[in-house]
Amino acid sequence: MHTLRETAIRNVTSGENVVIYQPANLYDCVLGDNVFVGPFVEIQGNTRIGANSKIQSHTFICEYVTIGQRCFIGHGVMFANDLFRDGKPNADRASWGRIEIGDDVSIGSGATILAVSICDGVVIGAGSVLTKSITEKGGWAGNPARLLRRL
């Protein structure tokens, strides 16, 4: 016996000219004007995506993420705010971190973003892992990500 679960777009508030490719799971989130969401994307609750931002395929955006305007999120980016401090998932949402992405940020494919803040105008290299907040505009890459060049 198989259980088939369909993709869902539920309780999404969206602006004008939003494009969402199926299959996708989006719920309890806000999408600004001209947002693009590629296929196989999940955007969880209490998340806001700013106007003119693009979320490419196979990206997972957990709860409590804010993405600014004119941002680019590459293919397969993972946002994670439960750091498994006890070695297992924590169901207490109050303990989850928050992720804040400024305006004009570009995040390369395959990057992992933990509970951090990223200032405006940052470029994150593909495959990078962000473990600490970024307060300086520039190109960042690596595991853990570090500043490679000021912009």
Regions found by a protein language model. Give the residues of each.
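Sparse recognition of residues in long alpha-helices and their boundaries
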Residues: 87, 137-138
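C-terminal/domain-terminus segments
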Residues: 121-133, 139
